[in-house]
Amino acid sequence: RGCPRILMRCKRDSDCLAGCVCQKNGYCG
């Protein structure tokens, strides 16, 4: 919830915008 719908690659939750977590597919969501 509250995660901007922007495709962002990540390795960890802190790579993502506020409200997002790093998913298993390597993208924030």
From Swiss-Prot:
Keywords: Disulfide bond, Knottin, Protease inhibitor, Secreted, Serine protease inhibitor. The record marks 5-6 as: Reactive bond. The keyword Disulfide bond applies. SUPFAM superfamilies: Plant inhibitors of proteinases and amylases. One of its GO terms (cellular component) is extracellular region. One of its GO terms (molecular function) is serine-type endopeptidase inhibitor activity. It is found in: Secreted. Disulfide bonds join 3-20, 10-22, 16-28. The keyword ATP-binding does not apply. InterPro entries: Prot_inh_squash, Proteinase_amylase_inhib_sf. Pfam families: Squash. The presence of a 'disulfide through disulfide knot' structurally defines this protein as a knottin. Belongs to the protease inhibitor I7 (squash-type serine protease inhibitor) family. Inhibits trypsin. This is Trypsin inhibitor 2.
